[in-house]
C-alpha cells in the first residue's frame, strides 16, 4: 500500500515553538496539523532548561556581559513581545553552531546566500565572549541566540524528531526593532559600540529582502513591561511609539540604555529601505515565508496553530514599517489591496433578477418543466459561484484574520482545492475535446474512403451487369465534400422510413443522424406511399432489376460465414464498428455509420419493396451496414442461379445449412462483445439469468425500499482508491473478491458518505469498515455493544497484523494510558479503536480525546455495529445507543457507518433519525439465509427434551449448537438433562458471574462443550461459524429476534438446522412477563405484544413458506418455489404442504365467534381450550356441568381435527377477532377468551379468511410419504475412503486451531477462518504457496500458524496419493477378472436347463462372492490408508475399528466403519434376494 506524499512542514518561529505566541493556553499538544497528510509531530530542536525559574531569569538578566538573546515572538502585536532565556551545555548545540550553507530560491545570484556566522563580526564578538566567560560562568549564563525561524536556524538540518519538546516557560516582554543594511555594508562603529555596551541582550538576524536586496536586522530588548495600547495616529509609526515607550521606561534607571536606543533609532531611520507589499503573494507570517501547494505564499497546510483566531495580524507592525519609510506625520496610507470587478457584472445580475424562471410556481408545473428549471438554476448557481470566487480570490487571506471565527488555513485549503478541481476539470475537458476531434477526423477519413469504395463498387456492379441493349443510366454520385455538407442520412432512420419501426429499434444517438437531405427525403416519401412527384428510373416489372434482387439474395445466402457474423451474433464485432466508438440501441453497428451513399441501390430497393407489397423482410431488424458488410462477388459473366427461392424471393429453408450456421455461431460466441445491446435473441436468457442472479444477491425488496447498492453508483474499480483497495484486500485479508454489496459500501465510505448497511449474519459486515480503516489515515472508532465481540474482533485483527485496540474498564491503567498517548500522537498508530456506547456517553476523558483527534482530522469514521439497538421499535433497544446521536452533531464532518443484520422498515427509519444521519446511502442485502433449514415442531412438555437429546446425539460429535430457553431455570434444567443423556452441555445466563460466563463461553467456542443452553441475550456477535443447529426450547419474543438468533447457525455456509419448539402457553408466559414489568410504557408494551403475536402467527401457519414469512416482515419478496429450489434446505411447510389444504373458513370463524359471545357473556369465563372442546363436540365433565353440550354451538366443528380447531381460535386471537385476558391465580396465569375489537369486521364484513386444515389420514400419509422419500433419497458414494481422508483432515485442523486458541486465550476464529480450514481439508496443500493461495490465508497468519497446519495437510495429501494408487490398481484387477466372462454369451453348447436348475444356488453364491469382494475391496482401501498413517496393519474388523479410533476423530471413524459394514450387509442381502437372472451390477443409487 503506497504511502501518501508528505507535504513539507512549515518552518515555525522559535517563539511559536516554545509557547511565546500570545496564547496563554498554548500547550505542546495543540501544535497539530489539521490535515491527515501531516507528518509525525516535530519538536523544538533547541533543548530548553526547564529548571530555570523566573527569579533566576530576572537575576541573570540584570548581570553584566552574559545576557540572554531574546527569542523573537510570533505574536500578532510586537509590542506585547516577551523575552525568554535559553541556555545550552555547549556551543555546538546552540543555534549559532556552524552548519553547511543553505541556499534559498529567493536569493539573488549576486549576493551571498549562506548564513555563515563564523565569519561575521557578530559571531567573532560572541565567540570571544563565550571563550572568556565559559570557564567562569555557570551554564545558565551561556549566551543563547534566536533566529527569525527554523528556516534560518543553523540547526535546521538536524533531526527534529530527536529533540525534546519542553513546556513553555513564563513569558517576558520584549520589544522588536527592525534594522536594515545593504549586503555589502560591514558592521559600523555605532553597531560595535552597541555590541560592546552593557546592553548585550539583543540579536541581529540576517535574512535577505526580496524587494531591495537589503538585510533586515532584528533587535530584541528585555525587561519591558507591556505598554498601554497607543492611540492610532497617522503621524507616528509603530517603531517610533515603541522606541519612545522603551526610552520612557529605561531612561531614569539606565541612561546608557537610552543612549543606545537613540543610536538604534537613528540607525533604523538611516538604513531602513522601503519595503513595499505585494498583495497576496506575501505570506501571512513575514518571519516564515513558504510556498503553499498552489504556488502562492500563504499558510502552510497542516502547520501548527493554523486555525487559531488572532486579535491582530502578525505582520501588522511590519506592514506599517514597510509602508512608512519616513516619519512624515501627514503622509496618508495608500490602500494595500486592489480588486478588479467585471464591468458587465451589474448588467448580468440585473438580467438574472428579471429571469422568467423566478416567476414559476413549482406546485403548478409538470415534471419536464421542473427539470428544465432545476437545470437552469444549477448551472446559473455554478456560474455565480465562479464569479463570486474570482472576486474573493483577489483578497488576501490575512485580510480576514480580524474576523472572529475565521479559520485562515481552512480557507486556504478550500481555495487550493477549488483551484485543483477547476484545473483538473479543464484538463479533462481538453483531453475529451482532443479525443473527440481525433475521432471526428478519423470518422471523416473513413467516410471519405468508404464513400469512394461504394461509388466504385456501384459503378463496377452496374457496368458488369448491364448489356448494350438494355442499359440503365447510372445515377450521378455526389462528391465527398457535397455529401459532407448535405449530412448523409442515418441508415437506421432510413430503414425505419422504408419499412416501419422494428420492435427493437432505438432512436439515433445524435440530432445529426436524424437530418436527411431534401432529395433523399423526398425519395423515401415516394417509396413509402406519400404523394409521389418522383419518377423512378425504370419500370416496376423490369426483369433486369428482378435479376439484381435475386443476385443480392443469392450472395447473402451463399456466404454462410459472413451472413452468420451479422445475423446470429450477440453484438457486432467487426473492427470498423469499434472504430466508431460506443453505440446505443439494438442496431449497434449502424447507429453512427451514416456516411455511405445509398442512391445506387434506392431503385432496386423500391422495386423490391413494391414486389413484396409491404411484407417485411427478416433482414429489416438489422442495419444497412450489417447487410453491406457481406462481400459481394464480382461477376464478369452472368451465371445461372442454382438456389431455390420461395414466393418472396428468399432461399428456402435448408435444415443442414441451418445446423451448420448454428454450430458456427456457437463457436464464434466467445468473440462477441457485450458492450451494448444485441439484436440476437440468444442474449436475452443470458441477461435475464444475470439479472436474476443479481436480484437474488441484492434481494427483491418492496417497491418503496431505497437501495443504493443496485444503482451502480458505487460499482466497479473506477475510483482513485481502487488500486490500493484491491491490494489491501489481498495482502491484509487474504481475499481475492468481495461478497455482495461489500465493494459498494467500501467505495461509498471511502468517498466520505454516511452509510446504512443491512447485511445478514455472515454477510461480511466487518470487512466493510475494517478494510477502509487500514486505507485511511487516522482512527476508526467502532462502537460495539458487547465486550466479548470486541475481544474476538481485536484478536482476529491482531492475527492479521492490524493494529486494533479497545478501551474498557477492565483494562490495566498502564494499557489505557498507552492507548491515550498513542491517540494524542500524530498520526496515531491505532487504526481501529473499539469502545462500548457507555464509554462514549460517560467518559469525559475519552470525549476530550475525540475532540483532540477531530481537531487534528484524525477521526476516519464512526462505525456503529448492531445499530438496531438504537431504535426503541427494535427487539434489542439499549438506552446508551440512543445517545450516540450526539456524535453527528459534535463531529458533523466525520463519516458514519451504521451496520445491522435485522431491521424492519420502521426500525431503519428510526435508526437514521436517532443517529442524525441525513444524506445517508442505503445498502440492503437479501435477508435470505439459503443454507438454513427452518422447522417448527410441537412442544410436548418434558418429552421435548428427550427429542432434543435424541436429535443432538444423532449428529456427529464435532457438531455444536445452541439451545435457547426463556428463563434461567430452564437453562439449568436443560443443560442437566443434556449432560445426563451424554451430551456435553453447559448453561449460560445473567445469573452467573462474569468469570463463569466468560469461561463457559470460551469452552463452547473452543469445542470443549458441544451445546450451550442460554437465554436470548447470548450470541450477539459471537464469531463461531461452525454452529450446526440452533434449537429454541421456548418461543422467541419477535420474528426479528428469532431471525437473528437462528441466524447464528451456519455462518460458514454449510447446511444448518433451525428448529423451534412451539407451544401456545409460552406466549402466555411472555405476556405475563410483560404485564409484570411496570416500567414499560403503554406504547412500548403494545409494540412487544404485537411482535409476540406475529411470531405466534408464524408458528401457527402451516402452509406459507417459513422464509417467505420472515422476509416479508423485513420488506422482501420471497416465494415457496424459490424455497423448494434446494430441497435439502427447504422449510417444513414447503415440504409438507401436501398434507394440508386451504379452505375458506369465514363461516367456521363466525360460528366460533358466536360460541364465544354466548358462552363467555356476563360473568362466565372460559379458556380457549374449553371453547375448542365445545366446538369439537367433546363431552367432558366440565362441558356437561355447564350444560354446554346442549347449546347449538356444541359440535359445529366436529369434522375438523382438534389441532385445527385450536389453531383457528388462535388465529382469531392474533387477528383481533378474539382476545385473551390473563388473570393470575396463585401465580398461575389463566387466559380467558372474549370477543376482540375487530369482531365487527368478521361478522359484518367479508374478509378473506383462508385457513389450512389437515387432510384426511390417508391423503396426509401419502403426501408426507412421497415428499419424505424424495427428500431422503441419496446416492451412494463410491469414494468413501477419499471423503474420510478429507473429514479426518478437517477434524485435525479444527483440533489444532482449538488448541492454539486455548493456549492464547482467544477464540478459534481469531486463529484461522473456518472457510480457510475447509479449503485446506479439500485441497490438501503441500507448499507454502499453495497454502497462501487459499482465501483468508495471509502472510501474517501463515507466519504464525501456517507451518503446523501445513504439516497436517501434507500428511493427508500423501495418504490420499497412496489410496488413489491402491484404488487404481484394484480397479484394473477387477476389470481384468471380468473380461473372460464376456465370452460366455456366444457359447452355443451351454446347457440352459442345468443353468436354470442351478440358478438359485449359483446366483446366491455368485452374489455373495461379488458382494464379499466389493466389501473386502472397500475395507482393504481403508486399511491401506490407516496402515500408512498409523504404521500398523490389521485384518480383522475389530482391529480395523480400533485402528480408526486411534487418531483424532476416532469415535466418528468407528461409527463410519460400523455404518459402512451395515450398508455392505444390506447391499448383500438385497442382491441375494432379488437376483434371479444374470449377475448384473446394481444401479446407481440403489442399495
Swiss-Prot record:
Helicase ATP-binding domain: residues covered: 746-921
Residue positions where Phosphothreonine is found in the record: 113
Keywords assigned: ATP-binding, DNA damage, DNA repair, DNA replication, DNA-binding, Helicase, Hydrolase, Isomerase, Metal-binding, Nucleotide-binding, Nucleus, Phosphoprotein, Repeat, Zinc
Matches recorded under SMART domains: DEXDc, HELICc, HRDC, RQC
Binding, Zn(2+): 1105, 1123, 1131, 1134
Extent of Polar residues compositional bias: 17-29, 271-283, 318-328
Positions occupied by motif DEAH box: 865-868
Cofactor list: Zn(2+)
Positions bearing Phosphoserine: 52-53, 92, 94, 108, 118, 120, 130, 151, 153, 180, 182, 197, 203, 328, 506, 509-510, 535
Record's keyword annotation contains Glycosyltransferase: no
Residue window of motif Nuclear localization signal: 1416-1432
Site location (3' overhang DNA-binding): 878, 990, 1015, 1037, 1167
Cellular localization per UniProt: Nucleus
Skewed-composition ranges (Basic and acidic residues): 126-136, 163-174, 182-195, 203-214
Coiled coil: none
One Gene Ontology molecular-function label: ATP binding
GO cellular component: a single term: RecQ family helicase-topoisomerase III complex
InterPro entries: DEAD/DEAH_box_helicase_dom, DNA/RNA_helicase_DEAH_CS, DNA_helicase_ATP-dep_RecQ, Helicase_ATP-bd, Helicase_C-like, HRDC-like_sf, HRDC_dom, HRDC_dom_sf
Residues that hold ATP according to the record: 738-742, 762-766, 1051, 1313
PROSITE patterns named among the record's database cross-references: DEAH_ATP_HELICASE, HELICASE_ATP_BIND_1, HELICASE_CTER, HRDC
Description of how the protein assembles with itself and partners: Monomer. Homodimer (via N-terminus). Homotetramer (via N-terminus); dimer of dimers. Homohexamer (via N-terminus). Self-association negatively regulates DNA unwinding amplitude and rate. Oligomer forms dissociate into monomer in presence of ATP.
Sequence similarity: Belongs to the helicase family. RecQ subfamily.
Function: Participates in DNA replication and repair. Exhibits a magnesium-dependent ATP-dependent DNA-helicase activity that unwinds single- and double-stranded DNA in a 3'-5' direction. Involved in DNA double strand break repair, including the synthesis-dependent strand annealing (SDSA) pathway. Involved in DNA interstrand cross-link repair.
Domain remark text: The N-terminal region mediates dimerization and homooligomerization. Both the helicase ATP-binding domain and the helicase C-terminal domain form intramolecular interactions with the HRDC domain in a ATP-dependent manner. The HRDC domain is required for single-stranded DNA (ssDNA) and DNA Holliday junction binding.
Protein name: RecQ-like DNA helicase Blm
Amino acid at each position: 500500500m503506497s504511502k501518501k506524499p508528505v507535504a513539507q512542514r512549515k518552518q515555525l518561529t522559535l517563539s511559536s515553538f516554545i509557547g511565546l505566541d500570545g496564547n496563554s493556553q498554548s500547550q505542546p499538544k495543540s501544535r497539530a496539523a489539521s490535515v491527515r497528510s501531516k507528518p509525525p509531530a516535530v519538536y523544538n530542536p533547541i533543548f530548553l532548561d526547564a529548571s530555570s525559574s523566573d527569579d533566576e531569569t530576572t537575576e541573570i538578566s540584570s548581570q553584566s556581559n552574559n545576557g540572554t538573546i531574546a527569542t523573537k515572538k510570533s505574536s500578532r502585536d510586537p509590542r506585547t513581545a516577551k523575552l525568554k532565556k535559553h541556555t545550552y551545555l555547549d556551543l555546538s548545540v546552540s543555534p549559532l553552531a556552524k552548519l553547511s550553507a543553505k541556499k534559498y530560491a529567493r536569493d539573488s545570484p549576486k549576493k551571498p546566500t549562506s548564513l555563515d556566522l563564523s565569519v561575521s563580526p557578530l559571531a567573532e564578538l560572541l565567540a570571544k565572549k563565550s571563550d572568556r566567560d565559559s570557564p567562569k560562568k555557570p551554564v545558565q549564563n551561556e549566551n543563547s541566540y534566536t533566529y527569525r525561524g527554523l528556516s534560518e536556524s543553523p540547526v535546521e538540518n538536524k533531526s527534529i524528531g530527536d529533540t525534546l519538546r519542553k513546556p513553555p516557560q513564563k513569558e517576558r516582554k520584549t520589544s522588536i526593532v527592525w534594522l536594515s543594511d545593504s549586503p555589502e555594508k560591514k558592521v559600523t562603529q555605532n553597531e560595535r559600540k552597541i555590541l560592546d555596551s552593557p546592553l548585550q541582550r539583543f540579536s541581529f538576524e540576517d535574512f535577505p529582502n526580496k524587494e531591495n536586496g537589503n538585510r533586515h536586522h532584528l533587535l530584541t530588548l528585555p525587561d519591558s513591561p507591556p505598554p498601554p495600547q497607543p492611540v492610532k495616529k497617522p503621524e507616528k509609526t509603530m517603531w517610533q511609539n515603541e522606541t519612545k515607550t522603551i526610552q520612557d521606561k529605561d531612561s531614569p534607571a539606565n541612561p546608557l540604555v537610552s543612549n543606545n536606543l537613540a543610536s538604534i533609532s537613528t540607525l533604523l531611520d538611516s538604513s531602513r529601505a522601503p519595503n513595499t507589499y505585494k498583495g497576496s503573494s506575501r505570506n501571512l507570517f513575514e518571519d516564515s515565508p513558504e510556498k503553499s501547494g498552489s504556488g502562492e505564499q500563504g499558510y502552510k497546510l497542516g502547520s501548527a496553530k493554523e486555525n487559531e483566531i488572532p486579535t491582530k495580524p502578525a505582520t501588522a507592525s511590519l506592514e506599517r514599517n514597510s509602508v512608512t519609510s519616513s516619519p512624515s506625520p501627514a503622509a496618508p496610507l495608500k490602500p494595500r489591496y486592489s480588486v478588479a470587478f467585471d464591468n458587465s457584472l451589474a448588467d448580468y445580475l440585473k438580467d438574472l433578477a428579471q429571469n422568467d424562471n423566478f416567476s414559476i410556481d413549482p406546485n403548478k408545473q409538470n415534471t419536464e418543466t421542473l427539470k428544465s428549471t432545476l437545470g437552469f438554476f444549477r448551472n446559473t448557481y455554478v456560474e455565480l459561484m465562479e464569479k463570486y470566487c474570482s472576486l474573493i480570490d483577489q483578497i488576501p487571506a490575512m485580510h480576514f484574520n480580524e474576523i472572529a471565527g475565521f479559520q485562515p488555513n481552512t480557507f486556504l485549503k478550500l481555495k487550493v482545492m477549488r483551484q485543483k478541481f477547476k484545473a483538473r476539470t479543464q484538463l479533462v475537458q481538453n483531453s475529451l475535446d482532443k479525443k473527440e476531434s481525433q475521432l471526428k477526423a478519423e470518422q471523416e477519413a473513413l467516410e471519405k474512403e468508404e464513400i469512394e469504395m461504394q461509388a466504385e463498387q456501384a459503378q463496377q456492379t452496374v457496368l458488369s451487369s448491364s448489356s448494350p441493349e438494355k442499359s440503365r443510366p447510372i445515377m450521378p454520385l455526389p462528391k465527398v465534400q457535397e455529401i459532407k455538407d448535405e449530412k448523409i442520412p442515418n441508415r437506421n432512420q432510413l430503414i425505419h422510413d422504408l419499412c416501419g419501426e422494428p420492435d427493437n429499434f432505438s432512436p439515433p444517438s445524435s440530432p445529426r443522424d436524424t437530418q436527411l437531405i431534401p432529395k433523399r427525403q423526398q425519395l423515401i416519401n415516394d417509396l413509402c406511399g406519400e404523394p409521389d412527384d418522383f419518377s423512378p428510373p425504370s419500370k416496376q416489372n423490369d426483369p433486369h432489376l428482378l435479376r439484381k434482387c435475386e443476385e443480392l439474395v443469392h450472395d447473402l445466402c451463399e456466404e454462410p460465414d459472413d451472413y452468420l457474423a451479422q445475423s446470429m451474433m450477440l453484438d457486432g464485432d467487426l473492427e470498423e464498428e469499434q472504430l466508431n466508438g460506443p453505440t446505443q440501441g439494438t442496431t449497434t453497428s449502424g447507429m453512427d455509420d451514416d456516411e455511405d451513399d445509398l442512391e445506387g441501390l434506392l431503385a432496386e430497393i423500391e422495386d423490391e419493396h413494391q414486389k413484396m407489397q409491404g411484407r417485411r423482410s427478416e433482414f429489416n431488424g438489422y442495419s444497412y451496414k450489417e447487410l453491406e458488410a457481406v462481400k459481394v462477388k464480382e461477376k464478369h459473366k452472368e451465371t445461372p442461379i442454382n438456389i431455390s427461392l420461395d414466393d418472396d424471393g428468399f432461399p428456402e429453408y435448408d435444415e443442414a445449412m441451418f445446423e451448420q450456421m448454428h454450430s458456427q455461431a456457437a463457436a464464434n460466441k466467445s468473440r462477441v462483445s457485450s458492450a451494448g445491446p444485441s439484436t440476437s435473441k440468444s442474449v436475452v436468457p443470458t441477461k435475464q439469468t444475470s439479472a436474476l442472479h443479481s436480484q437474488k444477491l441484492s434481494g427483491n425488496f418492496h417497491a418503496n425500499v431505497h437501495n443504493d447498492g443496485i444503482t451502480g453508483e458505487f460499482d466497479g474499480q473506477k475510483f482513485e482508491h481502487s488500486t490500493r483497495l484491491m491490494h489491501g484486500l489481498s495482502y491484509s485479508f487474504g481475499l481475492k473478491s468481495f461478497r455482495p454489496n461489500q465493494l459498494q459500501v467500501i467505495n461509498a465510505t471511502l468517498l466520505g458518505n454516511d452509510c446504512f448497511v443491512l447485511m445478514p449474519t455472515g454477510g461480511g459486515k466487518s470487512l466493510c469498515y475494517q478494510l477502509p480503516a487500514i486505507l485511511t489515515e487516522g482512527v476508526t472508532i467502532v462502537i460495539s455493544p458487547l465486550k466479548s465481540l470486541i475481544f474476538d474482533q481485536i484478536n482476529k485483527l491482531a492475527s492479521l497484523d492490524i493494529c486494533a485496540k479497545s478501551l474498557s474498564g477492565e483494562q490495566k491503567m498502564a494499557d489505557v494510558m498507552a492507548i491515550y498517548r498513542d491517540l494524542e500522537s500524530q498520526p496515531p498508530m491505532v487504526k481501529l479503536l473499539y469502545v462500548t456506547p457507555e464509554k462514549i456517553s460517560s467518559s469525559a476523558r475519552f470525549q476530550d480525546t475525540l475532540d483532540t483527534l477531530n481537531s487534528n482530522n484524525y477521526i476516519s469514521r464512526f462505525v456503529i455495529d448492531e445499530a438496531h439497538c438504537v431504535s426503541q421499535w427494535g427487539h434489542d433497544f439499549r438506552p446508551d445507543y440512543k445517545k450516540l446521536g450526539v456524535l453527528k452533531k459534535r463531529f458533523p464532518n466525520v463519516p458514519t457507518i451504521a451496520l445491522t443484520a435485522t431491521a424492519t422498515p420502521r426500525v431503519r427509519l428510526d435508526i437514521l433519525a436517532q443517529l442524525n444521519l441525513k444524506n445517508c446511502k442505503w445498502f440492503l442485502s437479501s435477508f435470505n439465509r439459503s443454507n438454513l433449514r427452518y422447522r417448527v415442531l410441537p412442544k410436548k412438555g418434558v418429552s421435548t427434551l428427550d427429542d432434543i437429546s435424541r436429535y443432538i446425539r444423532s449428529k456427529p460429535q464435532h457438531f455444536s449448537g445452541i439451545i435457547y430457553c426463556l428463563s434461567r431455570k430452564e437453562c439449568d434444567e436443560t443443560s442437566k438433562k443434556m449432560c445426563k443423556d451424554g451430551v456435553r452441555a453447559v448453561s449460560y445466563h445473567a445469573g452467573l458471574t462474569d468469570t463463569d460466563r466468560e469461561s463457559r463461553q470460551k469452552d463452547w467456542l473452543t469445542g470443549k462443550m458441544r451445546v450451550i443452553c442460554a437465554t436470548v441475550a447470548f450470541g450477539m456477535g459471537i464469531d463461531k461459524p461452525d454452529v450446526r443447529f440452533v434449537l429454541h426450547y421456548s418461543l422467541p419474543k419477535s420474528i426479528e429476534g428469532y431471525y437473528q438468533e437462528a441466524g447464528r447457525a451456519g455462518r460458514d455456509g454449510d447446511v444448518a438446522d433451525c428448529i423451534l419448539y412451539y407451544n401456545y402457553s409460552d406466549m402466555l408466559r411472555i405476556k405475563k412477563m410483560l404485564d409484570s414489568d411496570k416500567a414499560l410504557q403503554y406504547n412500548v408494551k403494545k409494540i412487544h405484544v404485537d411482535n409476540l403475536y406475529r411470531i405466534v402467527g408464524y408458528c401457527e401457519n402451516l402452509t406459507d413458506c417459513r422464509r417467505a414469512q420472515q422476509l416479508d416482515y423485513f420488506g422482501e419478496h420471497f416465494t415457496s418455489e424459490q424455497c423448494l429450489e434446494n430441497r435439502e434446505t427447504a422449510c417444513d411447510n414447503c415440504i409438507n404442504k401436501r398434507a394440508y389444504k386451504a379452505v375458506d373458513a369465514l363461516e367456521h370463524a363466525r360460528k366460533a365467534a358466536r360460541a364465544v359471545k354466548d358462552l363467555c357473556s356476563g360473568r362466565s369465563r372460559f379458556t380457549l381450550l374449553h371453547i375448542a372442546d365445545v366446538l369439537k363436540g367433546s363431552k367432558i365433565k366440565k362441558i356437561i356441568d355447564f350444560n354446554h353440550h346442549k347449546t347449538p354451538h356444541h359440535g359445529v366443528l366436529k369434522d375438523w381435527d382438534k389441532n385445527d380447531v385450536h389453531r383457528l381460535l388462535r388465529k382469531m386471537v392474533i387477528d383481533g377477532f378474539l382476545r385473551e385476558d390473563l388473570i393470575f391465580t396463585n401465580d398461575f396465569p389463566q387466559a380467558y377468551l372474549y370477543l376482540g375489537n375487530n369482531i365487527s369486521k368478521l361478522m359484518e364484513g367479508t374478509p378473506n379468511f383462508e385457513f389450512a386444515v389437515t387432510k384426511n389420514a390417508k391423503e396426509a400419509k401419502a403426501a408426507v410419504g412421497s415428499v419424505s422419500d424424495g427428500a431422503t433419497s441419496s446416492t451412494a458414494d463410491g469414494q468413501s475412503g477419499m471423503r474420510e481422508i478429507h473429514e479426518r483432515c478437517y477434524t485435525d485442523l479444527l483440533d489444532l486451531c482449538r488448541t492454539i486458541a486455548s493456549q492464547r486465550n482467544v477464540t478459534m476464529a481469531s486463529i484461522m477462518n473456518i472457510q480457510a480450514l475447509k479449503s485446506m481439508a479439500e485441497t490438501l496443500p503441500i507448499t507454502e504457496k499453495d497454502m497462501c493461495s487459499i482465501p483468508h490465508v495471509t502472510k501474517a497468519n501463515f507466519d504464525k500458524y501456517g507451518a503446523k497446519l501445513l504439516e497436517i495437510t501434507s500428511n493427508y495429501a500423501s495418504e490420499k496419493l497412496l489410496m488413489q494408487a491402491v484404488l487404481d490398481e484394484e480397479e484394473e484387477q477387477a476389470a481384468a477378472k471380468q473380461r473372460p466372462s464376456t465370452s460366455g454369451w456366444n457359447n452355443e453348447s451351454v446347457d440352459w436347463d442345468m443353468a436354470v436348475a442351478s440358478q438359485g444356488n449359483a446366483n446366491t453364491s455368485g452374489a455373495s462372492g461379488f458382494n464379499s469382494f466389493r466389501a473386502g475391496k472397500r475395507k482393504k482401501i481403508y486399511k491401506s490408508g490407516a496402515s500408512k498413517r498409523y504404521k500398523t496393519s490389521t485384518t480383522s474388523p475389530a482391529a480395523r475399528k480400533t485402528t480408526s479410533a486411534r487418531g483424532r476423530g476416532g469415535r466418528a471413524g468407528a461409527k463410519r466403519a460400523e455404518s459402512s459394514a451395515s450398508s455392505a450387509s444390506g447391499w448383500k442381502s438385497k442382491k441375494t434376494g432379488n437376483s434371479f437372472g444374470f449377475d448384473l451390477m446394481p444401479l446407481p443409487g440403489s442399495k
